[in-house]
């Protein structure tokens, strides 16, 4: 984090820094649920091996986000906006 701030401070203003990690866990689990609900329609195009691997990928990534082993950050930079940028969540 400090490297990003240090490298950008002479060029940009860091307006916002947001962690989406806990949201991405929920997103991955929603994709997992929708993928498996849609499997009857997808099964003619994808193998059972692909299904197992994709389920493993989605669940492993969701678990890593849940355990906070990985993070997803969005950093908003500007060249300087008078009054700053208001970010709504």
Curated annotation (Swiss-Prot):
Name the family: Belongs to the CFA/CMAS family.
Asked whether the keyword Methyltransferase is assigned, the reply is: yes
The molecular function terms of the Gene Ontology recorded here are: cyclopropane-fatty-acyl-phospholipid synthase activity
GO cellular component: a single term: cytoplasm
Role, per record: Transfers a methylene group from S-adenosyl-L-methionine to the cis double bond of an unsaturated fatty acid chain resulting in the replacement of the double bond with a methylene bridge.
Q: According to the entry, what is the taxonomic lineage of the organism?
A: Bacteria, Pseudomonadati, Pseudomonadota, Gammaproteobacteria, Enterobacterales
Active-site residues annotated for this sequence: 61
Query: Which residues does UniProt assign to the signal peptide?
Result: none
Q: Mostly located where? A: cytoplasm
Organism the protein comes from: Citrobacter freundii
Going by the UniProt record, its keywords in alphabetical order are: Cytoplasm, Lipid biosynthesis, Lipid metabolism, Methyltransferase, S-adenosyl-L-methionine, Transferase
- Tell me what this protein is called: Cyclopropane-fatty-acyl-phospholipid synthase
EC class of the enzyme, as a word: transferase
Please give the catalytic activity noted in the UniProt record: a 1-acyl-2-(9Z)-enoyl-sn-glycero-3-phospholipid + S-adenosyl-L-methionine = a 1-acyl-2-(9-cyclopronane)-acyl-sn-glycero-3-phospholipid + S-adenosyl-L-homocysteine + H(+)
**Subcellular location per the Swiss-Prot or TrEMBL entry:** Cytoplasm
Q: Which GO terms describe its biological process?
A: lipid metabolic process; methylation
């Amino acid at each position: 984090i400090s490297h990003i701030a240090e490298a950008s401070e002479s060029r940009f203003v860091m307006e916002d820094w947001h962690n989406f990690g806990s949201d991405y866990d929920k997103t991955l689990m929603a994709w997992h649920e929708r993928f498996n609900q849609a499997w009857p329609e997808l099964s003619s195009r994808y193998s059972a091996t692909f299904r197992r691997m994709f389920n493993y990928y989605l669940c492993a990534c969701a678990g890593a986000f849940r355990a906070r082993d990985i993070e997803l950050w969005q950093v908003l930079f500007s060249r300087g906006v008078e009054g700053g940028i208001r970010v709504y969540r």
